[in-house]
């Protein structure tokens, strides 16, 4: 009888542990993460439990959340890896979490790769299926990031002439209007021409790009912005 009771208890504990692992969702994980004392502890917590998530949609959302947190902490290389893992998981959206398509996650990975100064990885992701996206927003972002890749690989200001010319042309392309603030900010930063900062202030006065160009905010520290060649008077 004692043996039977022991077996039943052991089975119950095993079943309880299994159910706990199955019940861990991206939403529950994120809720626990934000209760940590600091972002570093939140990241460590997520990394310690993310392997317990078995449902693909939940795992995808969990890695996307981890990438978002790492990007906010300027851990761009780590964020790029997290976004990449999420993008590679074929699944729908998790309940209670931000909805992100695989295409959007690829774009997130590209942005972080560029922020980390890893333009080779960024180019590889841009040359994936995302280039054939049916989303106008994604297509516009791909075109913008293509030029950012070119700027990242430039070793002199002269090598920025071609991507700058492309960015100037994009200002007149209707499908690129969604990225116009970013295009204007890039042109202002690279060329130093006040025309672009004035356009930002006039057309997008409340945008983060306008705040940066007018000195009300600073560009977030990232290798892309620090090492890309630019014209300095």
Task: Describe every region a protein language model picked out.
Residues 48-59, 88-99, 131-139, 171-177:
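Flexible helix-coil transition and linker loops at the boundaries of alpha-helical arrays
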Residues 186-233:
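Terminal, low-structured helical/coil segments at or just beyond the last alpha-helical repeat
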């Amino acid at each position: 009888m004692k043996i039977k009771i022991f077996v039943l208890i052991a089975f119950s504990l095993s079943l309880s542990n299994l159910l706990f692992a199955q019940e861990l969702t991206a939403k529950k994980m994120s809720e626990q993460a934000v209760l940590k004392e600091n972002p570093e502890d939140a990241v460590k917590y997520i990394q310690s439990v993310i392997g317990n998530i078995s449902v693909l949609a939940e795992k995808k959302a969990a890695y996307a959340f981890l990438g978002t947190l790492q990007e906010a902490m300027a851990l761009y290389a780590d964020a790029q890896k997290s976004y990449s893992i999420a993008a590679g998981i074929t699944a729908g959206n998790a309940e209670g979490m931000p909805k992100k398509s695989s295409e959007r996650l690829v774009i997130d990975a590209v942005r972080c790769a560029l922020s980390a100064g890893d333009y080779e990885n960024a180019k590889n992701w841009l040359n994936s299926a995302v280039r054939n996206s049916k989303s106008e927003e994604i297509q516009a972002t791909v075109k913008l990031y293509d030029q950012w890749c070119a700027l990242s690989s430039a070793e002199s200001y002269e090598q920025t002439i071609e991507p700058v010319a492309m960015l100037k042309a994009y200002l007149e392309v209707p499908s690129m209007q969604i990225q116009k603030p970013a295009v204007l900010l890039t042109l202002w930063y690279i060329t130093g021409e006040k025309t672009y900062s004035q356009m930002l202030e006039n057309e997008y006065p409340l945008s983060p790009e306008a705040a940066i160009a007018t000195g009300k905010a600073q560009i977030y520290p990232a290798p892309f912005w620090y090492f890309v060649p630019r014209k300095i008077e």
